[in-house]
Amino acid sequence: MIIKNIFILILFFCYSFSQDYLWPVQASKEITAVFGEERPGRYHTGIDVRTFGEIGYKLIAIDDGYISRIRTSSKGYGKTIYLKLNDGNTAVYAHLDHFTPELDNLVNALHQHYGKYTIDHKLEPNDHPVTKGDIIGYSGDTGGVSGPHLHFEIRNADGQP
């Protein structure tokens, strides 16, 4: 099982970071859960990056693109950003403490408009473009988690991890 996880992790990094992507968080480069790890009734679809039990580390746009979707929920991924990259892939950042001030204002307005905390809002390419290296949010422990960390995924154009 350990060899399988190591192999999957190597494949993930070879594919994901062969594209000159930046590391997604200004915390550690220590991975606490790998892609494909068995979970009750499913497999882990990304990697979890250690944030030393703390919230508030800067999350970085790994490449140029735009924020295509933002979600908030008290379950699952909690506060989440979907960053559509110019290469067609989508980077997913989950369990955020908060977004950038501009996105926080949008999310607060959506919460008020819909009268509920759970939202799933899609944005257009010109709504919120980002440049590689921009700060897009801050790490946290929202949703169904047991402690602060960044859950990070790269999905292909079909939405598959």
Labelled PLM ranges:
Residues I2-C14:
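Sec-dependent N-terminal signal peptides
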Residues V107-T118:
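A solvent-exposed, charged loop/short amphipathic helix patch at secondary-structure junctions
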Residues F17-T90, D97-E102, K116-T118, L123-N126, ...:
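Surface-exposed, glycine-biased beta-strand/turn segments
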Residues G147-I154:
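Histidine-centered catalytic micro-motifs
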